Amino acid sequence: MPLSLFPQETPDSTKNTIQAAPDTSTAAEKPLEHFVPVPDRWRSIVPPPYELYVKGKGHNPYYQNPLKGDYPIWGQNTFLILTGVLESFMEFSQVPVPSGVSTSNPGSFKFFGEGERLALNETGKFSLELYHGQTAYRPRDWELKVTAVFNINYLNLRENNGVNINPRKGDNRTDQHLGFQELALEKKLFDLSTRYDFVSIRAGIQRFGSDFRAFIFNDNNLAVRLFGNFGGNKYQYNFIYLPMLEKETNSELNTVFHDREQDVFIANLYKHDFGVLGYTTQLSFHYNNDKASTHYDENGRPVRPAPIGLIREHEIKAYYLGWAGDGHFGRINITHALYHVFGDDDFNQIAGRKIDVSAQMAALELSLDKDWMRFKVSGFYASGDNDPLDDRGQGFDAIIDQPFFAGGPFSYWQQQGLGLTGVALVHKFSFLPTLRTNKLEGQPNFVNPGLLLLNAGYEAELTPKLKLLMNVNHLRFVSTESLEHFLNQPGINNNIGVDYSLGLIFRPFLNNNIICNFGAAGLTPFEGFEDIFETNQTQFSSFLSLALTY
């Protein structure tokens, strides 16, 4: 059994009136008189009687206990962490909603009907993490991670066909689903050096984000991942293959046993302190093979192939080359990304033919910290297709993006999914106007208008418990020709509008056990938005979320 050294309390010299003779022995000759071997450093050491280090209780997460990995459950190096999370979400928004043929309101002649929407979402997560190794520094020898998730959601619209393709289902829906968001086993293969450089493999359902801001891929899905570091942790790398699982439509959880007919491969390399201290750069390669298939979502809507143009199954092979970075140069914080995608779509439905893909994306954020405040400016560009009928797809699309950029989930444009006929202009938690049916279940579309976004933002730590986020975005299409062809509507303007948002993050106990988020956002339409959605009324949304972690 391994031994550890623990400092013992020394006698109080004031209690002994006899003076000891001076110690003339050298340091090498002195025994370790103040240290004794301890066979079990986790349980044999009794905490002192004062309150700061009281002995743990199993039901209290603020005390030390073996259920959250403070003590090993077996031997000296096997730990168990149990975590429960309850997330509540409520949102009210004004969103253009297609009314369909069977409108719920008599006399509704416009294509877009009443847009008020109420969404409620309750999610319970239970996570088990069993691992062998040390609690810090050294990579774990092996790990088992299981996260089961139960979701119940409610959606209320003012129009039929919005919650289900069958108008007899009405204008509201309640649904529930149970799935696994993590079910993976990790094993360290070998060490590369005495500085904890290592190579490990993880197989199963796991979470993976391919860059700093999730511009291309961010998902929980089935995968085999080889990862590690070298050079004293100055270099980190990932090789990951994902035979994608199908998603449940309304909860967006994994279905576990249904193949998505899509293969994704990602390789990336990180270099810390590149050029200057505090700046990390990344090179990446993504491969997306979205195979030809037919699929209907849980609400009866066709999502593969998309119900637009010439409907035919088609296969997409796309290759992404990327360079990204995150860090700071002096006082200036910087995040940037640059991607080029190429490949082919053997039958694009808008073009009505095979197309060769060639599109680009660029993003840059600069910020400056002053005391408890941060001032930000950023820009985002995704190329658009200016000729939807030729044999080139020049509109940029991602695999599964979820960017926290320019306001992220607090902004109206990224928070709301704006629907059109059979497809969506933009999807929830994305700002790419891609004209695809569904970000998770639909196929990428590289014949799209693209986007130019300019942002100014402000963040403030108002108190140690309360954080404020404010953002203003100007949105503009790069090329509207694909929209004009798809909607059979000439003369669509490039200007979308101005998106402004406010967010509050409240942590009452200065930790992540309780997190309360509030967001309010609006979009003032310009000519392009009005041309598409037939309204110049300011759109709005607000949400409140609460996350409890035990």
For each feature predicted by the language model, list its residue ranges.
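Outer-membrane beta-barrel channel domains
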Residues: 30-38, 63-75, 98-100, 104-258, ...
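Extended hydrophobic secondary-structure segments that form protein cores and membrane-embedded regions
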Residues: 82-85, 142-151, 199-206, 282-287, ...
